[in-house]
């Protein structure tokens, strides 16, 4: 059939049974066939808008079902005329997404439309071809209105159903997945629907998009040629309306609303329907509309849960497709993306700058940088503009985009070297990343540093950027106030070391030597010397002596003879045979005959002066003894030799230049030299860069150490890793930092401890890698340990030793709070390492003892472990010999002192049959120790390097732990000490008498010198005696408080058995019992068998028994402590005693006080008075430290004087302040002292000018806040004490303290912060009305707490407390500014009206004065606002009843301290606990004062 006849062909009419059902459709078809004219009168078809408007009718569902069945008959024969006939019903179906619930029909309609699409496309093709044929022949073209309407209707239905079904399918699948997670499945009736959904996802939706694409990309072969975009000729002679194309664009826009787009698996589907955008932008010039289409997706809510913007990558994939016409399509899509990038940079600028952008916008920026980084780099200025956005998330996403562009292949090193523009862009990006490490927002700073770390991990940072101050800039973030930023900075530094391009060796000293050598080599290379010149010079120097002798002889001959010198005709012959015999004569004759000979005038004059004498002289000689002639000869010889050397070198160079082979060789040497110079310069620059990096890292080490010691857990763990890397990379200062870092071993945190131990294993214990032998590994481990101990300070040595102990103690149980972390396999110190250390320590050869000392110090913690103590006991006699060496004696004695530590087997309950490690009192060990003891004690010098106190302490410890009879050994040592001190005093008195009785001046002067010597010796020995007594008291206290209860628990079962059998406990023959155990076993006079054997009751009984024993048995007059106590008292009270001894006696007395309640009660006032008023810093610090034992042994008595300890936190000495904070931390962590309001004195140390004190104070309050709610309870008292009275802090320091404390409360419940307003306002009642400064200080707290509606209400409820201070204009101004700021930042109208009312009341008091109702009890400025006044029982926003409030008051603990209590004299003792409780109880029962009720309720 011809084409022109196919256009008018009609389908066969339906059967008679369907005529009735199709009446509605026929009517609709007849109405559509009525031609209409537009305004221009060109055509009779309707616009797509008119078609939609006429079809927007709600047709009954029954009619829709009937029309769909009728429409199926048309689809069966692929007849598109069913589309305009049944369009009203199909349009109503596609429009009613919720009211028409028969989704099966919708899937059927999709099948029908797909079946009709092919015929419709063919009809359109024939129609367009017919149009061009008639246009070519000049015939009139008749518009096929039905076909035009069918095309528009088909597009409408396809667009609507595609979007509607896609959204429905996505919703159904999401619902099914959610039900599957909950365990509930679907019913069986929806099996068919599930099949339709699967068919839709796999096939039908792609077909629907293909139908639209086929219309858009329709190509028709006509008489005028192949026509692209043939769909536009359907509307000829009219122009295709824009709304028709917008229906295609709307398909994509509405499909963007589908939450399924968020899934990564949907990228293929997105790419498919994005082909519509591809065609619209390439063929129809809708670039701007396509770009705007992407921005409509920013408002979709499902993207808030997405991780990326899913619509850029499919668009880029289409842009980069290779196929026919790709060149045509590529540029339009590229223009689309360029428009998107341009609009992204300007979208939130100007008037929209304050509007917060959605998350999708930020993801779009990042997606553009990943997929089209080349386009973004071309429009990099638009991206830079985003960095100026005020919203944090925009700046963060922009930095992320810049980092992705920086790491892209577009800015690779090779391309940047080739193209200068790319290099400049790379530098610009890097500078902006660095600049935003100092952004005002914490998250931005952290993001910038993290991005730099990611770039460094990928090794994308160029070498020239690494040494340009990068580490200094990022390292400065270690001082950031944010933990997050500090952690990111430490992670970057660690990553930098792991991925640096300079290797693992950053040793500064070694690289300095290398640099000097390379610089010297470079200087020599840059100043080359010809081989010909060098050879000539060397040959001339070798024959210089012979040549000079010949020249000198010839010169003398010239002076002696009368003949005229004949010149040599050519010097070439002379130079050729220069080193042959006689050449010196010819050289002299040649140069003397030259015109430039400088001595020509002087030789004839000398010859003329002696001519008369020479006439009759047969010898014809001239005397050579004349000085002038000798010097002249020397000058001539020197000049001739110099000229000969110069001419000889020139002669040799000329010979070389005439040789062509030599010239080529010289040229090659020059090229090699230039290449060598370039390499040397590169090596020198590399060394300089490496040393610069090392220097920057060394500065970062100090700051990182501070973060480790004072930071949070997260940054501590990262800091440990960084310092470990620095140690392994040999960064300067890393060794000292590692030693200081070991102090973390005392932290009560399992995570930190495990991280520290793992780092110590990496640093100290070598691994067995490759073909390395085990002996080499052990030697390396030994050297690592020795290096760690070498040069360690006394402050850090205990921490380092504890870390080594944990490495050696495999018996310790591994504790890890992180259950998800796989425990790392421990690498303990091997036995061979321990043996090597013993070999070094016990080496008997004479030499430097520093390595032996370090080895002994390492062996000390190792010997404490289960594996090391057996080895140490076996080497006791060898260690004993080291006591004879003064340098090694103290460290050797330390090892001996721990040999009595019980092993795991000795601590078992059934260990009675096993021997203990005890040493008899007659053993030679005690003689060696006693000899060392008195050698150190009796020295009269004050050398600070001598550790005489360590010898005292270790000697006492050794006696208590190793002696078989302490009751014999310790008194014996003390008696010898006292005896020697007595003998020294006798010598002093003897020479005093000698001075008084001496009559001869010589004898008197000698006696005076000896008297002064013994006086000085007595002073020093007496001081050491006091230290000895004090140490005996301390160790006896520990021995009694710890050892005796332990032994009692161990022997309690045997004691019970002995009483039952009425027999003594039999001493085991294989066991050496100590004297204390003998007393327990045989006499049974120290302990009694407890009646109650439960742990709590037993502990109380033991504590009571130990106290009774100390009071009744320890200070017996004829026993050790009873004899030593009078010596201490004498040293304190004797007025003629030197101050140094009196201070030592005071310290010793403070150590003896915990042993006896009677002594403590008598001496406590003097003790605390000396602690607070002594002029000696050392004495005050020691007495503060003694408070630990005092508070443990005598808690009730210590509470009476605790205020004196709190006051010491404001001592003038930073050492005393630091000691006080440490003691308070120990006492409060063990609940040995009550927290008081005077703890505010310790809070002043938070801003102490001394860093050590400041760090200790901050750590103290952090730990206190983590354990209890003390800071919440006492914060109002802190604020009041720090702002009131004569000791008011400066406002800047006050804010620093408050901000630190309030930062600790950020994790506390909100109710605590709300009640804080009431408690702070109550403090106004205790403030003098004339005081205008304290209210300003308290305003700092109110401004922080009053940040919401509830806070403002509480501030209004407490109007009566603070309104009286509004009479001061300066105070009123500050409070008015606070309320105005709250008014300006709030968006709540009611809140703003309350702020206005509060400002009006402040102004009224300021202008009219204070009114009676302003200070009346129960006054509130919101009475007329309908808000009821709160009574004290509901002040905290609580719904508790009055009775419950009363019960809470009765149950509440006593208040910390009232303000009146804190103002008492510091010298007076505080009230006992019972009195404080009675006082609190009375104040809780009495309800006439609402302030106290409120305080009790809050606490």
Curated annotation (Swiss-Prot):
It comes from the Eukaryota. SUPFAM superfamilies: ARM repeat. The keyword Cell division applies. The keyword Lipoprotein does not apply. Residues 1458-1467, 1486-1499 have a biased composition (Acidic residues). Coiled coil: none annotated. One of its GO terms (cellular component) is dosage compensation complex. Sumoylated. Sumoylated in the context of the dosage compensation complex but not in the condensin I complex. Sumoylation is important for assembly of the dosage compensation complex and its robust binding to the X chromosome. Disruption phenotype: Results in high larval lethality in hermaphrodites, and survivors exhibit a XX-specific shorter and stouter body morphology. Higher percentage of spontaneous males through X chromosome non-disjunction. Increased number of crossovers, redistribution of crossovers and a reduction in crossover interference in meiosis. Increased number of rad-51 foci in early to mid-pachytene indicating double strand break formation. Increase in X chromosome axis length indicating aberrant chromosome structure. RNAi-mediated knockdown results in chromosome segregation defects in mitosis. Keywords: Cell cycle, Cell division, Chromosome, DNA condensation, Meiosis, Mitosis, Nucleus, Ubl conjugation. Residues 1-43, 1421-1499 are annotated as: Disordered. Residues 1432-1446 have a biased composition (Low complexity). GO terms for biological process: cell division; chromosome segregation; dosage compensation by hypoactivation of X chromosome; meiotic chromosome condensation; meiotic chromosome segregation; meiotic sister chromatid segregation; mitotic chromosome condensation; mitotic sister chromatid segregation. It is found in: Nucleus; Chromosome. Pfam families: Cnd1. One of its GO terms (molecular function) is histone binding. Expressed in somatic and germline tissues (at protein level). Component of the condensin I complex, which contains the mix-1/SMC2 and smc-4/SMC4 heterodimer, and three non SMC subunits that probably regulate the complex: dpy-26, capg-1 and dpy-28. Within the complex, interacts with dpy-26 and smc-4. Component of the dosage compensation complex, which consist of the condensin I like components mix-1/SMC2 and dpy-27/SMC4, and the three non SMC subunits dpy-26, capg-1 and dpy-28. Within the complex, interacts with mix-1, dpy-27, dpy-26 and capg-1. Interacts with smcl-1. Required for both chromosome condensation and segregation during mitosis and meiosis and X-chromosome dosage compensation depending on its binding partners. Regulatory subunit of the condensin I complex, a complex required for conversion of interphase chromatin into mitotic-like condense chromosomes. The condensin I complex probably introduces positive supercoils into relaxed DNA in the presence of type I topoisomerases and converts nicked DNA into positive knotted forms in the presence of type II topoisomerases. Belongs to the CND1 (condensin subunit 1) family. This is Condensin complex subunit 1. It comes from Caenorhabditis elegans.
